[in-house]
């Protein structure tokens, strides 16, 4: 693995351990040339996924972009990083096991919305406002009414 600090190709693994519910390996590495230390993650990739954008353009699936989407929606919200990682891993696993190699971006967006709905209502509304292209206050009101109806159904079911 190339050192991100000096570019040396000769790095050494100092520690390896399972991470993210045993779906990846976390490796601590050190560069003998510059002494730099860094962490890498190794994940199983079942197939190379391509995302089909609304414009028709195809891009490789980027797990880190998915993580950033969650982080933006959840900014300043009380949700642990581990819960974000589990949600992202679940989405990536479902996409990889779907049998499809080309996934519409809309499908990924729907899965993110579903995950955010169970993580944090505020983050769900934030993401929905961008994903569904809200342009009026009524759009927010409709989503909030949808959340309130779900809460009422859950409360009635638990009573």
Swiss-Prot record:
Any one GO molecular-function label of the UniProt entry: DNA binding
Q: Where is the ATP-cone domain?
A: 49-139
Q: What is this protein called?
A: Transcriptional repressor NrdR
Q: Which organism is it from?
A: Agrobacterium fabrum (strain C58 / ATCC 33970)
The record's remark on the cofactor is: Binds 1 zinc ion.
Q: Where are the zinc fingers (unnamed)?
A: 3-34
- Record key words, sorted: ATP-binding, DNA-binding, Metal-binding, Nucleotide-binding, Repressor, Transcription, Transcription regulation, Zinc, Zinc-finger
Tell me which InterPro entries the record gives.
Answer: ATP-cone_dom, NrdR-like_N, RNR_NrdR-like
| GO process terms (BP) | negative regulation of DNA-templated transcription
Superkingdom of the organism of origin: Bacteria
User: Zinc-finger: is it a keyword of this entry?
Assistant: yes
